[in-house]
């Protein structure tokens, strides 16, 4: 564990010595990425040692996972499936461990910067405005804001929903509950004022911002990824974050705590969309074709998008400008070298259509 804690301190500092030259920036990028990969490897190994080979569960873009009780208890919110699962391998009074984890999960606030997902610290602050308020209803069909109601619901779940399974040498006790059917819309609504503010500030469509957020994180402000993309719009510090800071006349790159703040994250993600839209891909004349290119670039970079059409960037823009938007879409979704980027354009485009109807 000392290794993990040391890496938590070291990883954010790995880029601090980089200069302004491209070579220095690239070296910083490699160090930062390698540092984070080492941290994740250590963390996964630690979980495997405690829970077993088939029980490794780590936070992701659409999965909130928080360990407590010396890593013996964990809370998992699957924002795609709309489920909350609280589990423990504690051998003494597992119900008590589950009860505490259920209560703190139901009442946690929406300040991702205050919670360390890579430690077992019980650092979850109970909030008067819980992040999950309205997304979970108790056994009486009521939303949960107060500790007494969360405690009553936890007791109900333990009496009626507690499950037991065996995995390797461990007996795992768990409780699973469902989010309300429209949980995605409820989370999206929470961030609408910030989305509208950034849309107006940077000249980016609200529907596009919302579609990106849905696809990237399912509106999970705690979102992290294996590539160290952070927050609602999954902004990477040393790529998009650096470009946005340069646009704002700032040196360096945003910190993790900066990007875990929802307002900062939406601002940075939207600013980056505007950079793609107006700078990197500004030569694309048709707005729909440009939007397809921007969406794909948000996932895989503008350079890789243009190279689908030509190795020469100017020639690529000319080729796109002589194509119908539907052909641009077809080309990007079939010929982009990254399968993830090909699927990403389809997902975001579909999500954006649904937000345009609202």
UniProtKB/Swiss-Prot annotation:
Which keywords belong to this entry? Cell outer membrane, Cell wall biogenesis/degradation, Lipoprotein, Lyase, Membrane, Palmitate, Signal
One biological process term from GO is: cell wall organization
Which GO CC annotations does the UniProt entry carry?
cell outer membrane
Q: Which catalysed reactions does the entry list for this protein?
A: Exolytic cleavage of the (1->4)-beta-glycosidic linkage between N-acetylmuramic acid (MurNAc) and N-acetylglucosamine (GlcNAc) residues in peptidoglycan, from either the reducing or the non-reducing ends of the peptidoglycan chains, with concomitant formation of a 1,6-anhydrobond in the MurNAc residue
Q: Lipidation annotated as N-palmitoyl cysteine: which positions?
A: 17
- Signal sequence extent: 1-16
Give yes or no: UniProt keyword Cell inner membrane.
no
The subcellular localization recorded is: Cell outer membrane
S-diacylglycerol cysteine lipid sites: 17
GO molecular function terms noted in the UniProt entry: hydrolase activity, acting on glycosyl bonds; peptidoglycan lytic transglycosylase activity
Name the Gene3D superfamilies on file: 1.10.530.10
Entry membrane topology: Lipid-anchor
Enzyme Commission number: 4.2.2.n1
**Is the keyword Lyase in the record?**
yes
- Name the PROSITE patterns on file: PROKAR_LIPOPROTEIN, TRANSGLYCOSYLASE
As for family, the record states: Belongs to the transglycosylase Slt family.
Q: Which PANTHER family match?
A: MEMBRANE-BOUND LYTIC MUREIN TRANSGLYCOSYLASE C, SOLUBLE LYTIC MUREIN TRANSGLYCOSYLASE-RELATED
Purpose of the protein: Murein-degrading enzyme. May play a role in recycling of muropeptides during cell elongation and/or cell division.
Q: What is this protein called?
A: Membrane-bound lytic murein transglycosylase C
Species of origin reads: Yersinia enterocolitica serotype O:8 / biotype 1B (strain NCTC 13174 / 8081)
Q: What is the lineage of its organism?
A: Bacteria, Pseudomonadati, Pseudomonadota, Gammaproteobacteria, Enterobacterales
């Amino acid at each position: 564990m000392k290794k993990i804690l040391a890496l938590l301190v070291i990883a954010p500092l790995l880029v601090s010595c980089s200069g302004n030259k491209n070579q220095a920036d690239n070296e910083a990028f490699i160090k930062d990425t390698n540092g984070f990969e080492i941290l994740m490897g250590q963390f996964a190994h630690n979980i495997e040692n405690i829970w077993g080979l088939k029980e490794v569960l780590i936070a992701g873009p659409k999965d909130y996972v928080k360990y407590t009780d010396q890593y013996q208890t964990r809370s998992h919110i699957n924002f795609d499936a709309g489920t909350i699962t609280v589990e423990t391998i504690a051998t003494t009074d597992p119900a008590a461990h589950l009860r505490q984890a259920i209560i703190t999960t139901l009442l946690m606030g929406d300040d991702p910067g205050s919670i360390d997902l890579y430690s077992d610290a019980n650092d979850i602050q109970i909030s008067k405005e819980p992040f999950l308020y309205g997304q979970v209803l108790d056994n009486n069909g009521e939303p949960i804001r107060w500790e007494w109601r969360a405690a009553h619901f936890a007791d109900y779940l333990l009496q009626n929903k507690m499950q037991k399974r065996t995995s390797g040498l461990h007996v795992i006790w768990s409780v699973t509950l469902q989010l309300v059917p429209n949980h995605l819309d409820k989370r999206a609504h929470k961030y609408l004022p910030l989305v509208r503010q950034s849309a107006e500030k940077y000249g980016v469509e609200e529907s596009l911002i919302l579609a990106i957020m849905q696809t990237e994180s399912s509106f999970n402000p705690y979102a992290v990824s294996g590539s160290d993309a952070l927050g609602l719009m999954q902004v990477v510090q040393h790529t998009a974050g650096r470009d946005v800071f340069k646009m704002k006349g700032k040196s360096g790159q945003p910190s993790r705590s900066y990007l875990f703040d929802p307002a900062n994250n939406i601002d940075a993600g939207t600013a980056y969309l505007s950079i793609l839209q107006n700078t990197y891909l500004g030569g694309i004349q048709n707005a729909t074709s440009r939007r397809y290119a921007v969406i794909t670039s948000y996932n895989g970079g503008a350079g890789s998008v243009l190279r689908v059409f030509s190795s020469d960037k100017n020639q690529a823009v000319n080729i796109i400008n002589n194509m119908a938007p539907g052909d641009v879409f077809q080309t990007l979704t079939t010929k982009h070298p990254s399968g993830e980027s090909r699927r990403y354009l389809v997902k975001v485009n579909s999500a954006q259509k649904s937000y345009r109807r609202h």
